[in-house]
Amino acid sequence: MRGFAQLAAALAAFMVGQTLASPVARSLPGPVQVTPKKGDVVITPQNFLNGTWKGNETAKSDALNTAAISGTLPIEIVNNLAGSASGSINAYIQGQDTTGAIVFVLADGSFYYPPGTSSGVPVQISENLAIPLGAQGTTTTLTIPNYLISGRVYLAVGDLAFYMVSGGLVQPSATNPSDASANVNWGFIELTNSPTAGLFTNISYVDFIGLILGMSVTSSDGTVQTALGLTSSAVQDICTKLASQTASDGYPWASLCQTDTSGAYLRVLSPNDYISTDGSAFSDYWTSYISQVYSTYASSPLTINTQNTPGDVTCTTGGSAILTCEGSDVTFAEPTAGDIFGCNSGPFAVTGNAVDTAIVPRLCAAFNRGTLLLSGGNVQPSLSADSYYTTSPCNYYSKFVHQNEVDGKGYAFSYDDVNPDGENASGELTSTDASLLSITVGGPST
């Protein structure tokens, strides 16, 4: 599938007196084409894993201490990616061992400890870290030989580059279009298997969407939990809809999409991550809506149902640009676009008491979903999911992601779990006695 060429606005001509002015063309934002460069490394909180290092060594599974036996985790990876040949998809498994050292799982099932560095300049790991998968329709099995903390299982159509730097591991970056791995279609699931809490896995779309993944966890009693992920055509579908939204309102929704060097869609960034690369993006997108919200609740109260001990909390602005809520020891100034899409800055940085902690997720979710001015929106949360994303402005990235979720699981922004009935939209799967982690690549198995 080919990405959209940069969209162009229609030429406009108008009369000034008796003179026809020259046509004026206005280019609308389009997808970002990646330009991978070896050694172009940008370190962000999203692609950096803090950890120690042991040096260049490999620990075979049979050499691990006997206490590690309970930390083993069998994994199967099912290749559903249409047309993929044997060896075209690679898995990369990495994280920290129980001492905090950076470690990878190699294709032979051993732990590999990459050599560390005291340099602030990232050094690419030269070891072959890839675990090649079979062709479409096959299942690849392996076992993680010991506990793994703060881990990720990457799947990639091609090869990924990893780097060591003073303080830890640098992983591929979705936000850097010049990243060495930028032209590779990849994604990951989060994974922690600890001796105290057992297995935690997660699929999230808070930052971006890339290679389509799903998963299930089987416990020793036979119980199976699933997070099926997105439809196989999700990236194409979402980018098509984002391009249409840009054509409609002029905002850079289409630029959330990245294409490879041939023009095919690769991934979709969340608006929050896109703003981290272009601070002016969406700067006035919410301005009018925010003014209406703060005006509406000048005297008529906004009620936040904390769904916990604080109960219902009443908030008003009193006609100012500050929202004040009963029981909260902080106030809520008018947010910026970055505050709304990220839910962790400005008025949505949780710095207050338990009431503040309960208000922030519900208020930020209401902004993203565009429900604050709807009938019944004076109580948050109270409206059903059918009311989410029905008015503009809203978080269209989140809207289109949810339209492509097979089973409704997976956050598209930080507080996507806020619902009046407590419905769980999380892509997290947990087990204290997991016997198998199964991952699907390219869409769920039929």
Task: Identify the function of each model-found stretch.
Residues 1-35:
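Fungal secretory targeting signals
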Residues 22-446:
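Extracellular low-complexity, O-glycosylation-prone Ser/Thr/Pro/Gly-rich "stalks"
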